[in-house]
Amino acid sequence: MGELRAASNGRFLLDSIGELRRAYALADVVVIGRSFGDLHGSDMMEPAALGRCIVTGPRTEDFAATADALRAGGGLVDATRDSLAHVLAALIADPVRRAAHGRAACDVVRAQQGATVRTCALARRVIAMSEARTREHA
């Protein structure tokens, strides 16, 4: 993909894989389109990490843990097909609200950083406990 630019009206639609990060960097609001149909959402962590205001539809099953964490942290705006236009208009008209949702989303990502290290440490403890029990019963 070459240079990514918004249309003259400031809007663009992207249906692509591997190019979303560049598009998210241009966005004031990111709509997770796959969450409005039968595709069950898309990963929201990239736009969250960039501090973008994220709008999702009701179908986020494939990314439920991420959606739940973002929603609980105030970093996700829920919409339906019927409410999407109204939700977007309200967000576009309110840069303070957009920024607050974006900051909240980014805070959720920051809180999750280090999860792999914590998971490995927990796995090591579980393995050590299992080995100790095995030795006790041997």
What is the role of each PLM region?
Residues 1-138:
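Nucleotide-activated sugar donor-binding and catalytic core shared by glycosyltransferases
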